[in-house]
């Protein structure tokens, strides 16, 4: 795009003061490399004053915390342009998520004798320390092990869920368990693995993401956040020609070993710095775990531990308190669980009360 344009392409990126979550320097390097007119913006905890606005715009209990930076980068972008391109769909087309490699590795692990997995390997992993944040090696290793021995669909669901089945059993009130007894997330997800028509595990997982996570989370997030500020966001990777081409590729051109987006990275080697292509994917994560232990702790407690919230009858009060206490004492990382409960309660306050 930069090569085809007679004027510098405008690029936009957003970051955080917490460096573990900020990709600004990587975005800046790419912008400089292609000669773009680059714009940056920092999100700080006080930026969460925008939460009531987001709750109103989404109109449902939408709990993807990256809606915050998406809204802000859309607002900043709209000050310069009316239409912007994003990268949504690239991961689902060309296998960009780490979980695709993990699903493949788990197939090999699954071939070990069940007794060896359960009594030695999994027991050893459970002894690893907790905490350290969702991105720490120990947390990720334990999360992998809790799903590795499950059947494919349940394994995938365990790795993408905020609350897995045991967590929900501990959290839900008896009445809410009764109300939801006839439904399972597995039954909602499984048809997409079946519809893969005998394709390999990778293609089946890509299809499941394309038909669930992409339209129900990512596209909702970007569409609402961008249109809230009158910005039109377009996704070139979702052009049907690109999707059809990616679907025709053999799996080993999308995921090779542990290398995600294999073909896409090969093509881009002549265009982008190698340090950008070869680094680990971060995603559009938000340091909500830090914020819940700092500036937003009081707001969190006052919202989800309020008398009104605890009296709704959906969750066991002691289970909600436990999540808050363990997280704020840094004993466990319940960032995403607490964010989900927070957004649900804010939605109740806005639309139900």
Question: What residues fall within each predicted segment?
Answer:
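A phosphate-binding catalytic loop at a beta-strand-loop-alpha-helix junction
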Residues: 1-10, 84-93, 234, 268
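Short, well-ordered alpha-helices that flank and scaffold nucleotide-derived cofactor binding pockets
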Residues: 2-3, 75, 79
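Short beta-strand segments
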Residues: 10-15, 40-42, 73, 85-86, ...
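Acyl-group handling in specialized metabolite and lipid biosynthesis
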Residues: 12-17, 33, 37-42, 63, ...
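A conserved beta-strand->alpha-helix junction
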Residues: 17, 24-58, 83, 180-188
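Short, solvent-exposed loop/turn segments at secondary-structure junctions
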Residues: 17-19, 45-48, 90-92, 99-100, ...
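Adenosyl-5′-phosphate
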Residues: 66, 79, 83-85, 132-135, ...
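A mobile, often basic/glycine-rich helix-loop segment
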Residues: 94-123
